[in-house]
Amino acid sequence: MRKLLDAHGNQLVPALLAIMTLAVFWQVLGHDFLNYDDDDYITANRYVREGLTPASVAWAFTTFHESNWHPITWLSHMLDYRLFGLHAIGHHFVSLLIHLANVLLLYQILRSMTGSIWRSGFVAALFAVHPLHVESVAWVSERKDVISTLFALLAILAYLHYVACPGLLRYALVVGLFALGLMSKPMVVSLPAVLLLLDYWPLDRLNSVGRFQRFRRLLAEKLPLLVLSTASSVVTCLAQKSGQSLGTLERFPLVARIGNALVSYVAYIWKAVYPAKLAVFYPHPGSSLPLSEIIGAFAFLTCVTWLAVLAASRRPYIAVGWLWYIVTLVPAIGLIQVGWQGMADRYTYVPLVGLFIVAAWGIPDLVCGLVSRWKTKPSEGYVLPFSAALSLGVVACMSIIILAAAAWKQTGYWKDNFTLFGHALRVTRDNAVAHNNLGLAYAAEGKARQAIIEYTKAIEIEPGWADAHNNLGILYLRMRQIEPAEVQFRHVLKIAPQHPAGHNNLGATLLQKGDTNEAIKHFRAAIKADPRYARAYINLGTALDMIGRSDEALRSYLDAVRVDPTMADAHYNLGLSLAQKGKIKDAIKHYEEALRLHPDWPEAMNNLAWLLATQKRPSYLEALKAVRLAKKACEMSNYSDPVFLDTLSVAYAAADRWDEAIKTARKALSICRDPKTAEILKTRLGYYQLHTAVPP
């Protein structure tokens, strides 16, 4: 039986891994995009939505957007958008496929290094379905986790080929794959240290003879990789600083960071063993951690590290697995605080592999010691009696099934914003981020009362969080509650005086109050804080138009189109401004672009139809296009807008369809309530009856 399993294990294990991974995560294909980073990474990112164009590719390699430099991740999202558009199923499917590839690669790497099919399969199975890894797979914005790990694992596989047959080209492949991993997510900066650990075990490149000299040589061998790690770390710090993502020492004192890091190391281990109450966001405890808890964590980590080093000569996998966990978690442990979270499940995607290795090799060795039946074979190591091996296999399978069931349940929480953040609020305390994002979800559904409650709770927990005040202000503004909106936006600017959205939204509020000049000041302040803020340019143009400064307004609309050519509003306003200047051909082009970006926009259809029909000597095809556009605008308004009907009548007249022009003008006149517009319609109707188009 054992021989049969070993003979077919290398075919059976990958198949089982694939089936298990797909069974747990297949449900993500029915999940939505989330309001937690998915908008910035995909749904509202104009460069991603351009697809793989020269401009978007250049942006990917030069931007620090989202406080990161990860061009390969951006390119993967652009390719997804080109293939699937905004259908979330395709984006989730790609992330799932990459995770599956990582599972199979991890198995192949461990089996190649150790020769152990079943232990390697056990590690890969834990990696595949552990609930802590759900976040990296089920969250589209965390594509950077799975894709950076893909390149890191490919680099390790290439390294194994290099070790087997050293050569410059093979080493260059290792360096190249590592560089791609760093350009996907800098979390893999610790790969050179991981390779040194693998040199010790299981590659055994540090034997007892001349160990120090060999270590120096192996360290020198890693220098090109260390240079890349250093460069990536510097770039990452610059990116985080530019995006103001680095936590200040005032908010997160160094002592608090060290304490949280020590406790988090132990907490991740506990969650690996008992993955309960997992959440998308864990609030940072700050300085509230008990000193006894910090000292206890330090003592635990010190003792385990000491024991692992002591066992290194006889059980090298313990030291390698433990140090893998410690070293690969360093970039995300919070000594350099990024964001507000105290911990994050996604940070364990690679580090837990080290603990899985300790379990996969350590538990069988422990059982061997307990049953006192060791059989040493140079090629196979320690061999368990079949009955003990079978029992151990059953326990391992049960453990994997339990973890898979927990992961399946955890994956379900990522279905949409309501389930995700609702669950986070149930399993955490004082979670301002969860309240805020749940508020965003309610606001998107038009449930203003519930959204206000959630925003208010977020502000109660984090009074100094400018974005929460801004979100509440936006909601009040949409509800036409001008005074409460102004209060919130002024709170934003008190907290963060250079907050671009705060200035823009306060400007919009003041514009509704009629304080146009003050609104203009805030729109300009928003642009100064963020020169690529297209919405602020549009609002500035609107305000300038309102006080008759049409030339400046036109320049502002041109700036809006320049910084964001994919914003339909910018093209619409620019078209309106150009038409007022008599630049009809240019105005038509921008209305057409607005409709390309926003196909179901009746006002844009109406304005474009008007220009096509009323320009000097419109062609027959232009007149037909005007009719089609104006008719669709009327259909979308259920033929209840006299302005749209007037445009349709003019379009019919331009196409020499006089009876339809007369009928439509009469319909417009019958529902028109504005005396001036009614007079225009009467005059137009008289001309139509003479089969003559009146000048607009």
In which residue ranges do the predicted regions lie?
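Polytopic membrane enzymes that build or remodel cell-surface glycoconjugates and lipids
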Residues: 1-481, 490, 494-501, 505-508
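Conserved alpha-helical positions within TPR/SEL1-like repeat arrays
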Residues: 433-444, 467-477, 501-512, 535-546, ...
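Terminal, low-structured helical/coil segments at or just beyond the last alpha-helical repeat
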Residues: 617-624, 632-642, 647, 654-658, ...
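Short coil loop/turn residues that delineate tetratricopeptide repeat
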Residues: 423, 430, 464, 498, ...
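Structural marker of alpha-solenoid helical repeat scaffolds
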Residues: 427, 461, 495, 529, ...
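Structural signature of tandem alpha-helical TPR/SEL1-like repeats
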Residues: 413-419, 444-457, 478-491, 498-501, ...
